[in-house]
């Protein structure tokens, strides 16, 4: 991968260039942070399917190709799954490889694991405490030049926009149910979940891995209601979203969606 180095900016610039640069400088004073980005998954992003959040086929689950694997500093042991980030290639730092004035909004769907065998500045891009996005190639190409390999970026967390309602996918087995909660708008990520059935008192679920929440109750054969609180602090109750005839592997979409 090509390396990037910060270049000196000429002291005298045409007015049009100064105006363009201002749009890139402004994010650093408005809650933007600095990081780096690479890409993976091929031109159709088929290599990004699955992943440490558990969303499976990202085409089918609504996440598409504007996705990224997050370094562990961002991934937060899976608590950041589903969060959305607006990313701009830092054209001031690396004008050779950045598309000026472009941004892309991605969803965190995977973990970019650390590689301690490599230096954090030479291949170990996802080593902590680096904030790094290993982006799906189609997302990367909206802000950077293919042969760059790695570029400096500016990023900020933004609200997620999704089509349709929150989706619940039932996995695991009886007395060890795994509930995948996906297609979450607003803050994109989940803080807490509870479940209640006609034969089961309301009980909290715990995060097992990624966006999968677990229950040790026998939920088979029950109509299930879920209460979900987003990391933005909004709580929605999905009344009887899962019918009594549900089977493991089935997904159920709601008509409710988070706004924050």
Curated annotation (Swiss-Prot):
The protein's topology relative to the membrane is:
Peripheral membrane protein
Q: What is its main location?
A: secreted
* InterPro entries for this protein: Expan_Lol_pI, Expansin, Expansin/allergen_DPBB_dom, Expansin_CBD, Expansin_CBD_sf, RlpA-like_DPBB, RlpA-like_sf
The processes (GO biological process) annotated in the record are: plant-type cell wall loosening
This protein's record includes keyword Signal: yes
Annotated signal peptide: 1-30
Tissue distribution = Expressed in roots.
The protein's UniProt keywords, in alphabetical order, are:
Cell wall, Cell wall biogenesis/degradation, Membrane, Secreted, Signal
Per the database record, which ranges form the Expansin-like CBD domain?
Answer: 175-254
Where the record annotates domain Expansin-like EG45, the positions are 50-165
Which CDD domains does the UniProt entry name for this protein?
A: DPBB_EXPA_N (cd22274)
Q: Which SMART domains match?
A: DPBB_1 (SM00837)
State the compartments where it is located. Secreted, Cell wall; Membrane
GO cellular component terms, alphabetically, are: extracellular region; membrane
Give a Pfam family name: Expansin_C
**Record's function text:** May cause loosening and extension of plant cell walls by disrupting non-covalent bonding between cellulose microfibrils and matrix glucans. No enzymatic activity has been found. May be required for rapid internodal elongation in deepwater rice during submergence.
Sequence similarity: Belongs to the expansin family. Expansin A subfamily.
- What is this protein's record name? Expansin-A15
Source species, please?
Oryza sativa subsp. japonica
Gene name, per UniProt, is EXPA15
């Amino acid at each position: 991968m090509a390396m990037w180095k910060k270049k000196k900016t000429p002291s005298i610039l045409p007015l049009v260039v100064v105006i363009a640069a201002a749009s890139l400088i402004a994010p650093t004073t408005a809650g933007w942070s600095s990081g780096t980005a690479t890409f993976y998954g091929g031109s159709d992003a088929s290599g990004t399917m699955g992943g440490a959040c558990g969303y499976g086929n990202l085409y089918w689950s609504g996440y598409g190709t504007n996705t990224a694997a997050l370094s562990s500093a961002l991934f937060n042991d899976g608590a950041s799954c589903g969060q959305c980030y607006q990313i701009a290639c830092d054209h001031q730092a690396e004008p050779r490889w950045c598309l000026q004035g472009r941004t892309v909004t991605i969803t965190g769907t995977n973990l970019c694991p650390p590689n301690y065998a490599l230096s954090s500045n030479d291949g170990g891009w996802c080593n902590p405490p680096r904030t790094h996005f290993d982006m799906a190639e189609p997302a990367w190409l909206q802000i950077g030049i293919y042969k760059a390999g790695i570029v400096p970026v500016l990023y900020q967390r933004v609200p997620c926009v999704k089509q349709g309602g929150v989706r619940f996918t039932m996995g695991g087995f009886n007395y060890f149910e795994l509930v995948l909660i996906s297609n979450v708008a607003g803050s994109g990520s989940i803080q807490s979940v509870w479940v209640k059935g006609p034969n089961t008192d309301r009980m909290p679920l715990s995060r097992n891995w990624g966006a999968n929440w677990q229950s040790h109750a026998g939920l088979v054969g029950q109509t299930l209601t879920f209460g979900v609180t987003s990391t933005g602090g909004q709580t929605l109750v999905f009344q009887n979203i899962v019918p009594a005839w549900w089977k493991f592997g089935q997904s159920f979409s709601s008509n409710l969606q988070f706004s924050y």
